[in-house]
Amino acid sequence: MQQYSILVLHGPNLNLLGKREPNIYGSVTLDEINLLLSEEAKNLDVTVTCVQSNHEGILIDTIHQAWGLHQGIIINAGAYTHTSVAIRDALSAVKIPTVEVHLSNIYQRETFRHHSYIAPVAIGQISGFGVGSYRLGLLAIVEYLRKLENNH
């Protein structure tokens, strides 16, 4: 069985987790999320590389660089979820299976958050489970990749 490498992308303002609107996003920091993902990755015998940026171009460049390096992507694009055709196009271009995750349930929030440019190019979307959304996203992408491998 192949050992997969998963890129985890955190978008704008996620560096403020634990401080920013804890009533919506919880009190867990981004470093704690990354640690949780690293521990879960070990249990699944995969590796994760976590990148956070507040800049759309850096996120796009990181997606481009993932081509041939990572077999899966987990992305929480933050507010770019609802605005960035460029991130959507980058994900579509590299054709790496992607799971979109959100800490909060974006469909229970403001109407402008109900639309995702990423969802149509992702294999799935997980939202509303707090930190668990990331863990579920990792489990989902690994299961997807293993099924894909077994079918070939």
From Swiss-Prot:
Q: Name one GO biological process term.
A: chorismate biosynthetic process
Q: Where does substrate bind?
A: N76, H82, D89, L103, S104, R113
SUPFAM superfamilies according to UniProt: Type II 3-dehydroquinate dehydratase (SSF52304)
Catalytic site:
Y25, H102
Under which pathway is this protein filed?
Answer: Metabolic intermediate biosynthesis; chorismate biosynthesis; chorismate from D-erythrose 4-phosphate and phosphoenolpyruvate: step 3/7
* Keywords carried by this UniProt record: Amino-acid biosynthesis, Aromatic amino acid biosynthesis, Lyase
EC annotation from Swiss-Prot or TrEMBL: 4.2.1.10
Lyase as UniProt keyword: yes
Q: Which domain of life is it from?
A: Bacteria
Q: Name one GO molecular function term.
A: 3-dehydroquinate dehydratase activity
Q: Write down the InterPro entries for this protein, in alphabetical order.
A: DHquinase_II (IPR001874), DHquinase_II_CS (IPR018509), DHquinase_II_sf (IPR036441)
Which residues are annotated as site, described as Transition state stabilizer?
A: R20
Q: What is this enzyme's catalytic activity, as reactions? A: 3-dehydroquinate = 3-dehydroshikimate + H2O
Q: What does this protein do?
A: Catalyzes a trans-dehydration via an enolate intermediate.
**Entry-linked HAMAP family:** AroQ
Q: Which family does it belong to?
A: Belongs to the type-II 3-dehydroquinase family.
The record describes its quaternary structure and partners as: Homododecamer.
Name of this chain's protein: 3-dehydroquinate dehydratase
Its gene name is aroQ
